[in-house]
From Swiss-Prot:
This is Methionine--tRNA ligase, chloroplastic/mitochondrial. A motif ('HIGH' region) lies at residues 78-88. InterPro entries: Anticodon_Met, Met-tRNA_synth, Met-tRNA_synth_2, Methionyl/Leucyl_tRNA_Synth, MetRS_core, Rossmann-like_a/b/a_fold, tRNAsynth_Ia_anticodon-bd. Residues 582-602 are annotated as: Disordered. It comes from Arabidopsis thaliana.
Amino acid sequence: MAARINTSLHNALSFLKPFNTPLNTKPFSFRRNSFRFSKKLPYYSQFSSGKRALYCTSSSQESTVDEGETFVLTTPLYYVNAPPHMGSAYTTIAADSIARFQRLLGKKVIFITGTDEHGEKIATSAAANGRNPPEHCDLISQSYRTLWKDLDIAYDKFIRTTDPKHEAIVKEFYARVFANGDIYRADYEGLYCVNCEEYKDEKELLENNCCPVHQMPCVARKEDNYFFALSKYQKPLEDILAQNPRFVQPSYRLNEVQSWIKSGLRDFSISRALVDWGIPVPDDDKQTIYVWFDALLGYISALTEDNKQQNLETAVSFGWPASLHLIGKDILRFHAVYWPAMLMSAGLELPKMVFGHGFLTKDGMKMGKSLGNTLEPFELVQKFGPDAVRYFFLREVEFGNDGDYSEDRFIKIVNAHLANTIGNLLNRTLGLLKKNCESTLVVDSTVAAEGVPLKDTVEKLVEKARTNYENLSLSSACEAVLEIGNAGNTYMDQRAPWFLFKQGGVSAEEAAKDLVIILEVMRVIAVALSPVAPCLSLRIYSQLGYTEDQFNSITWSDTKWGGLKGGQVMEQASPVFARIELNPEKEEDEKKPKVGKKTGKAKVKVVEQTPTVAEA
């Protein structure tokens, strides 16, 4: 994959390191699962009312999380049959914002992502591109790392299922499940979807035995395979979901999972006799382990350290169980049904939550190369920069639901919110401060805001943003931060400090305080928006006179009013977000995209947002 694509100078900065400064504040209340599955007891008997439930809550009551508890967050391990697409980028952007928020709360975060590199589809894709499987996996896996860097994804662990340490964990896990009597050998005949790498029930297929996910006909196969006794875990899984309804989120995804289980669980094949590219089944090198039985264990193998012993006991000691599996809804069954049953069989704790988000469409249509309407993440971030891409998808898509992208909507949103509401407010205020106060704050922001209702408004909106971040309501969190910006703009317009400065005397003194208040609003915005748009937040912080090291040490407590101090010198005003402008001669085409045809292109242009005539 080519080297990292250069992004807009104003919308992209160097890759931000995660910040890990402790914070004395209420931690995110993902409650620790207090039970461990033992092979000595019936599985369904281990859920007593005396045990704490495995679920997430965002109530204001004291959390049951132990001090210093690790927050482990995972994306799926992405399949390397093809380069990353926008759906994968969306999942990872969301995960990164959650991880950054948890770090702001002072949590030790382990953010895991990686690539799933075994299976028939990988071998086929490699051959089609004239490569052997290892070469193909190296190339595509690196493309994911490159995209994550471009999007300012601050992951902690990147696991590849071709890593030797992963294979060691998979084989030990397989041996545990086998020893528990949950693996047996049998012949299987059925309809197989190569793209899903899964046998399908006829009742779930479309006309002509087409897979409902890939719209391609399934093929008839007969194999001698090893099977996992999933049916044995129907009652335990029903009990888990009944006692811990927040185990699967959003709630309508829980309903889907309960429906699958209620319809009856069937044992599933966990090996392939016709696939060479995979981890060999222990004691039977003629078969390889099914890609999903393999890949799910990447969430555990990622926890191991290269210089430590590679076994399950060591791996789980570094942070298992996961606090949150963040996935697309298309792989919900694997994570909410197969994976918990596998963990129970191996005597390991379950993850605390599985969150299945929706799909993305473009201009209201499903994306596809045949339609000529694919959305390429590399091109998008090259064109608009990471802040715009991150903000749009987290702000515009209600997390959990399906969402739609259109370039026209994208440009309108990021220009209105980031360039105008946030960027222009900062630019105007710093301009007035330079002209009238030599870029120096006259008093502490706490003193300036005495008796000013705006301070209370901002504090309420900060709490609203925090609650929404905790609830994984990322769109609502963005909206709360934007409301802070709107409140700051309203205050600026109502107070009209440019007019007060012209009055002189006490009026000018009040105007100088007004500028301190507005800049404190901007400082709070920079902290509260940093999980979503870290580079933009850094640029705001820098113009307020802070260093990058100071920004990297912020915590959520820095959203508390009172950070700016009298005598603090601000930097020269310059646009913190490049306004996106349509190419004028192509504007009409841009507003009316035609499927399968290239339309006019938008461009990023820095627009100096000068003060109004009255302000000047």
